[in-house]
């Protein structure tokens, strides 16, 4: 697997194909992509259900493991390549330049002033709820499998944590930007808090 370089090789761009834009925009509160919204939750929820219930319906660990891994793989591909782009206008991917150097690209589609908001609020809630909640559940399953000595399931659970955690990390990077932007945001926030506290202390002293 390609790893991100220690140098800042990430790119934050907002380049999406123009053909993906539509002229007639439904209301932002409506679900504009019902099929994408369904499959955004279907594969990841199905993997969790199979993990919890498979031993009740099948005594074959191999069959359960293969089913869960297939569902997790389908979920990873669908969320990374389809649902994120359609539901929230975000996309992350990797490319190799002419020098053979790996670059991670985090895209965020920005609406033009004429179009207004291009992301449905309902779809955004569905997307982020599924994206955050399911990896948290897999982390809980990992601790449960570890402490209950279910060693054979640990590899399956770790696969769930890695695949769904990778999508969560990628889309958070798309949403908030690169490490430089995160540092800038933190510095700006601390500066504002300090300025606000200093201003408040000055006003209090003046009042006395």
From Swiss-Prot:
Modified residues (N-acetylmethionine): 1
CC per GO annotation: Golgi membrane
Compartments it resides in: Membrane
Acidic residues biased stretches: 1-21
Primary location class: membrane
Membrane topology term: Multi-pass membrane protein
Keywords: Acetylation, Membrane, Transmembrane, Transmembrane helix
InterPro entries found in the cross-reference section: TVP23-like
The keyword Transmembrane helix is assigned to this record: yes
Residue span of region Disordered: 1-27
GO biological process: protein secretion; vesicle-mediated transport
Transmembrane segments: 34-53, 54-72, 126-146, 152-172
Record's keyword annotation contains Transmembrane: yes
Family under the similarity heading: Belongs to the TVP23 family.
Protein name, entry field: Golgi apparatus membrane protein TVP23 homolog B
Higher taxonomy: Eukaryota, Metazoa, Chordata, Craniata, Vertebrata
């Amino acid at each position: 697997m390609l790893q991100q370089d220690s140098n800042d090789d990430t790119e934050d761009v907002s380049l999406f194909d123009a053909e993906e834009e539509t002229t007639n925009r439904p209301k932002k509160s409506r679900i504009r992509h019902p099929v994408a919204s369904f499959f955004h939750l279907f594969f990841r929820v199905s993997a969790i259900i199979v993990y919890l219930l498979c031993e009740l319906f099948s005594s074959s660990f191999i069959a359960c493991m293969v089913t869960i891994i297939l569902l997790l793989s389908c979920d990873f591909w669908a969320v990374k390549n389809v649902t994120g782009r359609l539901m929230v206008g975000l996309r992350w991917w990797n490319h190799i330049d002419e020098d053979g150097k790996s670059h991670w690209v985090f895209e965020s589609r920005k609406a033009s002033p004429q179009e207004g908001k291009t992301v449905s609020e309902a779809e955004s809630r569905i997307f982020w709820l599924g994206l955050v909640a399911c990896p948290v559940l897999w982390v809980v399953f990992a601790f449960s499998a570890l402490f209950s000595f279910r060693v054979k399931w640990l590899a399956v659970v770790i696969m769930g944590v890695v695949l769904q955690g990778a999508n969560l990390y990628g889309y958070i990077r798309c949403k908030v930007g690169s490490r430089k932007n995160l540092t800038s945001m933190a510095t700006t926030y601390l500066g504002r808090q300090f300025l606000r506290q200093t201003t408040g202390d000055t006003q209090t002293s003046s009042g006395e």
